[in-house]
Amino acid sequence: MKGMIFLAAAILSEVFGSTMLKLSEGFSAPLPAAGVIIGFAASFTFLSFSLKTLPLSAAYATWAGTGTALTAAIGHFIFQEPFNLKTLIGLTLIIGGVFLLNSKRTEAADQKAQLTIEI
């Protein structure tokens, strides 16, 4: 549970950093530029904490996929960036991949539990 909380914080920090990157105007706006550095530093710190209890493949896929989806939503709703069928299909594939990677982790845990019970 603690790992998932750190992962959620990593995702939100990464989305914050990405949003500030857009607002930093090529790092020429000091406050958003500082937000980029703080956001990404916090994101990698929280991600590393989450990896103490979560598998790398599942945590990284969740972090990257969810961050991508949220950043695309912010781009569309805040910055009026285009959102079309190709974008929707791409995001659906990314999110589907995250679910598949996480289901692999669940299946492995179930198999391990069954082996433990059988022995």
Curated annotation (Swiss-Prot):
Coiled coil: none annotated. The chain crosses the membrane at residues 3-23, 31-51, 59-79, 81-101. One of its GO terms (molecular function) is transmembrane transporter activity. SUPFAM superfamilies: Multidrug resistance efflux transporter EmrE (SSF103481). One of its GO terms (cellular component) is plasma membrane. Pfam families: Multi_Drug_Res (PF00893). It is found in: Cell membrane. It comes from the Bacteria. Keywords: Cell membrane, Membrane, Transmembrane, Transmembrane helix, Transport. Disulfide bonds: none annotated. It is a multi-pass membrane protein. Belongs to the drug/metabolite transporter (DMT) superfamily. Small multidrug resistance (SMR) (TC 2.A.7.1) family. EbrA/EbrB subfamily. Part of a multidrug efflux pump. Confers resistance to cationic lipophilic dyes such as ethidium bromide, acriflavine, pyronine Y and safranin O. The efflux is probably coupled to an influx of protons. The efflux pump is composed of EbrA and EbrB. This is Multidrug resistance protein EbrB. It comes from Bacillus licheniformis (strain ATCC 14580 / DSM 13 / JCM 2505 / CCUG 7422 / NBRC 12200 / NCIMB 9375 / NCTC 10341 / NRRL NRS-1264 / Gibson 46).
